[in-house]
């Protein structure tokens, strides 16, 4: 896991804040919002992206007018969930992430859909996080929600080391451009206009 995180970190440095990143983010989020599970969802847990992640900032603002949008907040070793009520109600928290300042949301059974960030994913739906275990502790509290892993194409690898207790994603959503190919990338070069949505194989 350590070596895979190191590899992804080097690729993310090349990719962060690039024109390609913006293009891929737009395509990935277009695929996300077109997914039936997202369309049907009333309460959605998103994430306020860091500069090396799929950019969700405008997406959050857009959908907060139509759905109840939750965002995670780092509190010690846990992620608390809070309702997003607008950019004016955000403050910079741990790791420089913008976080809502409102009340904690604990009605986990009401959450229909989760967009999950990660360092890497594989075709089985396994996810590699940043190593702090925040989502590993959060996701078991929300077993009924549809879980979509969100990532750039270079973050899809042949295999993510997984433990028996790890929770798999229901789907991995990425754009399928292979501009940043590397030895672990399982996808062939594809047309830029296409969107790749791969259901994990169990």
Provide a role label for each language-model segment.
Residues 68-180, 186-189:
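Flexible, gly/pro- and Lys/Arg-enriched active-site loops
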Residues 13, 177, 202:
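Residue-level marker of positions within ordered structural domains that often coincide
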């Amino acid at each position: 896991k350590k070596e895979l995180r190191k590899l992804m970190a080097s690729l993310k440095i090349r990719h962060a804040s690039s024109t390609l990143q913006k293009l891929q983010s737009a395509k990935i989020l277009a695929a996300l919002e077109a997914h039936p599970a997202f369309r049907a969802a009333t309460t959605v847990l998103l994430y306020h992206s860091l500069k090396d992640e799929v950019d969700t900032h405008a997406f959050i603002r857009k959908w907060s007018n139509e759905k109840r949008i939750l965002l995670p907040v780092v509190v010690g070793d846990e992620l608390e969930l809070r309702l997003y009520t607008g950019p004016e109600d955000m403050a910079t928290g741990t790791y420089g992430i913008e976080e809502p300042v409102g009340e904690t949301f604990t009605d986990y059974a009401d959450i229909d859909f989760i967009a999950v960030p990660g360092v890497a994913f594989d075709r089985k739906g396994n996810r590699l996080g940043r190593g702090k275990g925040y989502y590993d502790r959060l996701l078991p509290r929300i077993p009924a929600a549809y879980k979509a892993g969100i990532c750039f194409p270079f973050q899809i690898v042949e295999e993510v080391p997984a433990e028996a207790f790890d929770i798999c994603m229901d789907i991995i959503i990425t754009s399928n451009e292979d501009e940043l190919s590397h030895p672990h990338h399982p996808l062939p070069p594809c047309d830029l206009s296409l969107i790749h949505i791969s259901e994990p194989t169990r």
